[in-house]
Amino acid sequence: MGGDAIVLYPYPGLGHLISMVELGKLLLTHHPSFSITILASTAPTTIAATAKLVASSNDQLTNYIKAVSADNPAINFHHLPTISSLPEHIEKLNLPFEYARLQIPNILQVLQTLKSSLKALILDMFCDALFDVTKDLNIPTFYFYTSAGRSLAVLLNIPTFHRTTNSLSDFGDVPISISGMPPIPVSAMPKLLFDRSTNFYKSFLSTSTHMAKSNGIILNTFDLLEERALKALRAGLCLPNQPTPPIFTVGPLISGKSGDNDEHESLKWLNNQPKDSVVFLCFGSMGVFSIKQLEAMALGLEKSGQRFLWVVRNPPIEELPVEEPSLEEILPKGFVERTKDRGLVVRKWAPQVEVLSHDSVGGFVTHCGWNSVLEAVCNGVPMVAWPLYAEQKLGRVFLVEEMKVAVGVKESETGFVSADELEKRVRELMDSESGDEIRGRVSEFSNGGVKAKEEGGSSVASLAKLAQLWKQK
């Protein structure tokens, strides 16, 4: 395998892997002299409560890698050994960070074989455990941040918050001010950042510190989409009193459509719906709702009168009436029958990229995961923002108040969204003047995303700077 070697190490989650693969493909398209190696791994299934979900995710990872390898033989996947057993002391929440730590000996072997041609290692943020090791070995180390630029602005401020407050709760009712961002309510910050005694928090603190010391941060975004946040990052306003590493925006990176999905029932159904008429509801691989919440969602959709395509996952395992319940067992009685002329409910999965690119889809109820947001923006689909976990509440603030490409649901203190609330937001998006304005803004960003990846576009230029940096080493 010749050429200057670039090694990419993604976290073993499908969304993280897809973004890394798309980065590798982009590099080879514009700079084919590089040799791309992706370190592929699967997550351990030793935690009983999540074993089934993780095993299913691992199967998806394996199938995805096979498909990519067949279509892109220039990308080399190096399969790391599966970590079959975990130390008992590992904090469950910190598992994503710890898993990378356990892989260090295996990764060092790979890096050693590429030593003479290795130009850079690109880490997922959850793979931060490699940073100190690679710096000691003088390997140029970059981070590929799979979330938004505005989320990075928050992440880089964590050491400052840690130094100047005892807890994020110290802000009280005063919104948090971060350069390049609208005012952030404390309630929108990820809950896991409030407890500083956990290893998870300590890992986040370490990651944000290391990112600031890295050779550069690569972002799956484009300049027009996050203009204010990116200007603040590049101006060093998010890292006071120390230099900011170079910021490279190379997006939007989203996976292409697969002809293998053309026969999926959701696409066949969409073929028979009017243009821009369908609301698509999908909440990612971890988007699990209680039966009570599913029932409220169903009633809200029914009352809205809108056409819908809804991906429904099973409720939490402790709520399951049987291992694989029917829709009738988890949705209101008669709902599927009453709405069959304008709605389709599919179980567990639908080909999201293909669905969002379909002419019939006119709205997207999303958990605000960044990959999903980019897919919607690139296809000109406006959103209803319904965050569930991690940094997604920050995403809602950004999508609704900064970008103005979404309407946001309002949940109770326990996170419950009523049927009336969902009905109201779906109607607002699909059938109002404000919804039309949102649709227009998304269309502008969609066009901007296309231009960013054309020759002379901002993302192609940013990628060229990155490649030049590696070639000079």
From Swiss-Prot:
Signal peptide: none annotated. Pathway: Pigment biosynthesis; anthocyanin biosynthesis. One of its GO terms (molecular function) is UDP-glucosyltransferase activity. Keywords: Glycosyltransferase, Transferase. It is an enzyme of class 2 (transferase). Sequentially catalyzes two glycosylation steps at the 5-OH and 3-OH positions of anthocyanidin. Unglycosylated anthocyanidin or anthocyanidin 5-O-glucoside, but not anthocyanidin 3-O-glucoside, can be used as glucosyl acceptor. This is Anthocyanidin 5,3-O-glucosyltransferase. It comes from Rosa hybrid cultivar. The gene is RhGT1.
